[in-house]
Amino acid sequence: MGCARLAAAAAVSSLTSCGEKEAKDSGLAQIVVGSDSYPPYIYLNNDGVPTGIDVEIATEAFRRMGYAARFETINWEQKTNLVESGAIDCIWGCFSMDGREEVYRWAGPYMVSRQVVAVDAHSSIRSLSDLAGKTVAVQSTGKPEEIFLSGSDPRIPQTVEVLSIENRSVQYAMLACGYVDGIAAHETGILQYMKDNAIDFRILEEPLLVTGLGIAFAKNDTRGLDSQLTDTLAQMRADGTLERIIGRYLENASQYLEVDTIGA
C-alpha cells in the first residue's frame, strides 16, 4: 500500500477511534453519527480530532439532549442501508433534504446550502447552458448527480457527460488537473478546497439548487430523536449558538441560517 493510501486509511480509523473515546469518556449514552470527510463540515484537525461545522453542532445539540455524539466514517453510497440497519443512528454531513423528504425521518433544516458548478478559472464556461458537450464530475448518490442524470432541469443541456465519483475529494483533483470541465457540489465545500489548496476555480453564478441541510434518521426509527433534535437546533439558532459555530468556519454566517427562505 502506498504512502497516500496508508495516510487515508489512518485518517479513517482516527476519525472513528477519537470520536468513540470522547463519547465513552463523557459517560452519556452514545449517538452514532455517520458521515464522510467533507471540510468544513466534518474532517480531522491537525491533532487528529474530528471537527467542523457539523461536528460542533452535533456535539452540542446531542449534549443538550443528554447524549454524546460519536462520529463514524461511512461509505456514503451505503448511508441508507447503514441507518436502516441500525449500524449508525443518523446521517449528518452537509446532507441535502431536497427530494429525500420521504426517504428518511428528518431533523432540520438547520442550514442553507447552494449546490453549484465550478470550472477552471480560465474556462469559457459561464453558465449552465455552456456545459453542452462538456464533462462534469459529481459524487455518486449525491444531489448534483440526481439533478444532472434526471434531465429535469431545462437549464442543463442533454449532451453533458456526467462522471460519478465515489470519493468527493477526487472531484476537485480531477478539475484541478483538467480531467473534467467542471464539478458540481456544495458551494461551501468547493470554497474550502480552494482555500486549503490555493487553487482558483470559478463558481458559476446560477446555482443548481438552493437547499436545506438536515439530519436523516431511519423511517422505522420511532425514538422521536428527529423531532427532539429539530427543537434543539431551533433553540441553538435562537440563542446564537449556530451562528457562532458557523462563523468559526465561514464568513457571513447569518446567511446560512436563512432556512425560512428556502423555496420562497
What are these regions (language model features)?
Residues 1-17:
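N-terminal export signals
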Residues 25-94, 102, 164, 228:
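Extracytoplasmic small-molecule ligand-binding "clamshell" domains
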Residues 36-37, 112-119, 195-234, 252-264:
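Periplasmic-binding protein-like
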Residues 44-46, 58-67, 144-166, 194-198:
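Ligand-binding cleft/hinge of the Venus flytrap
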Residues 55-64, 122-125, 129-143, 215-254:
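Extended ligand-binding regions for polar small-molecule ligands
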Residues 67, 75, 108-158, 220-222:
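A conserved helix-loop-strand patch within extracytoplasmic ligand-binding domains
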